[in-house]
Amino acid sequence: MNLKTGRVLKISGPLVVAEGMEEANIYDVVKVGEKRLIGEIIEMREDRASIQVYEETAGLAPGDPVITTGEPLSVELGPGLIEAMFDGIQRPLNAIKAKAGDFITRGVEVHSLDRDRKWHFTPLKKVGDTVEAGDVIGIVQETSIVEHKIMVPYGIKGTIETIEEGDFTVVDTVAKVKDKDKVSDLIMMQKWPVRRGRPYGRKLNPVEPMITGQRVIDTFFPVTKGGTACVPGPFGSGKTVVQHQLAKWADAQIVVYIGCGERGNEMTDVLNEFPELKDPKTGEPLMKRTVLIANTSNMPVAAREASIYTGITIGEYFRDMGYSVALMADSTSRWAEALREMSGRLEEMPGDEGYPAYLGSRAADFYERAGKVLSLGSEGREGALTVIGAVSPPGGDLSEPVTQATLRIVKVFWGLDSQLAYRRHFPAINWLNSYSLYLEKISPWMDENVASDWTALRTRAMSLLQEEANLEEIVRLVGIDALSEKDRLKLEVAKSLREDYLQQNAFHEVDTYASLEKQYKMLKLVLFFYDETQRALNAGVYLKELLDLEVRDKIARAKYVSEESIENIDAIFNELSEVIDELISKGGIMNA
């Protein structure tokens, strides 16, 4: 497309204003200056275009050429996404390193997907079959655990004229589809504009929980497959570790991890850990199901906005294949700060704390692309895209605009508490402030698939923790001696729930992940201890004797029982019953 070349009129950090751009459109990608820096038009006024440049603008000068490509910012979708690491505008970092060295050179142009690598394509359709947008015509075994489904692109339908098995690159024709007189070549790669959500058949009601292996989340504040959640918390409260834990252990088939404006070391941790950690379901390295988007704090600010959209478009693509996808965005506050900076340079009217007035609608555009859907196509595939965004409110102030805009949209809130973090209680999710609006939808699934009394146990445990908070107020005022033995027992059981159940060590090889079966048995064990000790108290046994029982140590160590030895927890139930029976039979006099 030969479009007229514009000229740079003004440069203000990542914002460039160009004139002579009357042939361009809003959101077109442009190449700025002699080095052809990548930018995107975000505002048009007559022949002037305001461009946010995704690379460092130092060295640009008024009068430099600006060439529009005539296309919106798009991502390439096809085999080669899994195990790859991209920057915010989907440039593969490995390819950039091979071409330009360890540092990203300005204006470097590389294809998002490798044009030389060949993939083995196995057709699932044959000549003469009728296909429509979204139909799977063949598969590519991308990694040992991900089967990449090659779908008919949106807008194409007809009858297959040719299709063949073999080794192809992502730009080789693998099939031809004829519709009336028009013949379309199908390749293994699609392009899709990042700011436009990928189409689907219809949205479905999410009812199945996304199992994370984190007890406080799965038991008290679960998120569904296709749900939305946010993790706000002050600095040092463990947001990134929570995000890493979810990326490691969530039972999603694909994980998209976006490091948006956070420290580079955190992405390095992911790169070092994921190839070595094994997926509990498949036994394969976690990296074989992961796409990484690294847009660290020292990369250009404008690209932070693009990285969020790049990541969710890749997530939607795998969702359309029928996969359950989990997307982690760490942190959406940095993305909002990028919006604020661009809004300030555009001289727009500021909203709360300088953020643009459209912050809420932009956040909604992002989170509303999550969901469980029936994909396009005749097969009726169901896919889910779960979005979990970290929010970094300055000073932990949850009333600031980004947190409030996010809370209006998402249905799960995992509030991280600096006080819990200072007490070394991790994950530092405050059980009194956090909530999940999916509980009613998930409870029937849990009762059916885990245990019939799961919901009842969860409700009892939550009420104990809330009663503990009330009793602690009394203890602070008049001291623990003013409490009855039954209330003191409640405090001890709530402490056991906090320390033996909710606390979880992300860096312990066993405690880092707990299956639902193990979570159920651990929770039931703590509440069984409460029931049995209440029975003993009513029979006249002294509270001190009950609290000194050796079996309490075994309850505390239940979290370190491996998944293969879960039956060992059952033995603690029997031992506890026997000890309590013996105490009662001796009238409460026993050296336990």
UniProtKB/Swiss-Prot annotation:
CDD domains: ATP-synt_V_A-type_alpha_C, ATP-synt_V_A-type_alpha_N, V_A-ATPase_A. Pfam families: ATP-synt_ab, ATP-synt_ab_N, ATP-synt_ab_Xtn, ATP-synt_VA_C. GO terms for cellular component: proton-transporting ATP synthase complex. It catalyses: ATP + H2O + 4 H(+)(in) = ADP + phosphate + 5 H(+)(out). One of its GO terms (biological process) is proton motive force-driven plasma membrane ATP synthesis. InterPro entries: ATP-synt_VA_C (IPR055190), ATP-synth_a_Xtn (IPR031686), ATP_synth_asu-like_sf (IPR023366), ATPase_a/bsu_AS (IPR020003), ATPase_F1/V1/A1_a/bsu_N (IPR004100), ATPase_F1/V1/A1_a/bsu_N_sf (IPR036121), ATPase_F1/V1/A1_a/bsu_nucl-bd (IPR000194), ATPase_F1/V1_b/a_C (IPR024034). ATP binds at G233, P234, F235, G236, S237, G238, K239, T240. It comes from the Bacteria. The keyword Transport applies. Keywords: ATP synthesis, ATP-binding, Hydrogen ion transport, Ion transport, Nucleotide-binding, Translocase, Transport. Its EC number is 7.1.2.2. One of its GO terms (molecular function) is proton-transporting ATP synthase activity, rotational mechanism. Belongs to the ATPase alpha/beta chains family. Produces ATP from ADP in the presence of a proton gradient across the membrane. The V-type alpha chain is a catalytic subunit. This is V-type ATP synthase alpha chain.
